[in-house]
Amino acid sequence: MSAKIIDGKTIAQQVRNEVAEQVKQRLAAGKRAPGLAVVLVGENPASQIYVASKRRACDEVGFLSRSYDLPATTSEAELLALIDRLNADGEIDGILVQLPLPAGIDNVKVLERIHPDKDVDGFHPYNVGRLCQRSPKLRPCTPRGIVTLLERYNIDTYGLNAVVVGASNIVGRPMSMELLLAGCTTTVTHRFTKNLRHHVENADLLIVAVGKPGFIPGDWIKPGAIVVDVGINRLESGKVVGDVEFDAASERAAYITPVPGGVGPMTVATLIQNTLQACEVYHDVQPK
């Protein structure tokens, strides 16, 4: 068996095209373009790359994009004051603060300062709580993007045994909630899990997000499984690989996401979707 590749690049482009068309329709109807503010504190090279891709996506779909590149010496109080201004700004529908933040700034305090209806990353306790209560509003980008991939490939998730490897607040925990909504019997594994192999071998749908290259051996994959690899790891050689041994896993899985070109593009595309949603659901004012 050779797995079918889940092409995140193509699906992400479809999503961006759909959003761009909706933006055109808004402008034709006399409405404003959605606005996204992207805040970067410090000069983390990886963060700069991620932020640049988000800004490019905004330009591509016709959003108003505002960039705030702050020095690493920015205080927590200064960052919170900027968020307060953006919360009150009628042109801004989404506020994204790129993580990680420099030492001395409390991530939790900053993310909770963003108003829930501008929280396009989906990290605010209100939005996480809505997801847990089966009534999601703005959903965390990577999990929502993964669900979109499964939907676009017409993969029926109801009744599947789903296993999430990794329990982070950004991917693993909200992913488990999305999988429950999608009708899966869901297991979350983490660093204290005993006999990880047993759980992986029983997974009809496997989501791996630990940030360790080749962490899941390919021969652990259940034949016919769906494998979603969230990991993005750069080796010393410069090659970018995921958390799953791709070649060996591809021989056993029915579907698999590549790295790069799988989940990564969907995270940015979903951020764009969330910003349009925030604009239309929360902030639209009819033209006079």
From Swiss-Prot:
The gene is folD. It holds the Pfam family THF_DHG_CYH_C. One of its GO terms (cellular component) is cytosol. InterPro entries: Aminoacid_DH-like_N_sf (IPR046346), NAD(P)-bd_dom_sf (IPR036291), THF_DH/CycHdrlase (IPR000672), THF_DH/CycHdrlase_cat_dom (IPR020630), THF_DH/CycHdrlase_CS (IPR020867), THF_DH/CycHdrlase_NAD-bd_dom (IPR020631). One of its GO terms (molecular function) is methylenetetrahydrofolate dehydrogenase (NADP+) activity. NADP(+) binds at residues 166-168, 232. Catalyzes the oxidation of 5,10-methylenetetrahydrofolate to 5,10-methenyltetrahydrofolate and then the hydrolysis of 5,10-methenyltetrahydrofolate to 10-formyltetrahydrofolate. It catalyses: (6R)-5,10-methylene-5,6,7,8-tetrahydrofolate + NADP(+) = (6R)-5,10-methenyltetrahydrofolate + NADPH; (6R)-5,10-methenyltetrahydrofolate + H2O = (6R)-10-formyltetrahydrofolate + H(+). Signal peptide: none annotated. The keyword Amino-acid biosynthesis applies. The keyword Transcription regulation does not apply. NCBIfam families: PRK10792.1 (NF008058), PRK14186.1 (NF010783). Keywords: Amino-acid biosynthesis, Histidine biosynthesis, Hydrolase, Methionine biosynthesis, Multifunctional enzyme, NADP, One-carbon metabolism, Oxidoreductase, Purine biosynthesis. Pathway: One-carbon metabolism; tetrahydrofolate interconversion. This is Bifunctional protein FolD. PROSITE patterns: THF_DHG_CYH_1 (PS00766), THF_DHG_CYH_2 (PS00767). GO terms for biological process: L-histidine biosynthetic process; methionine biosynthetic process; purine nucleotide biosynthetic process; tetrahydrofolate interconversion. Homodimer. Belongs to the tetrahydrofolate dehydrogenase/cyclohydrolase family. Its EC number is 1.5.1.5, 3.5.4.9.
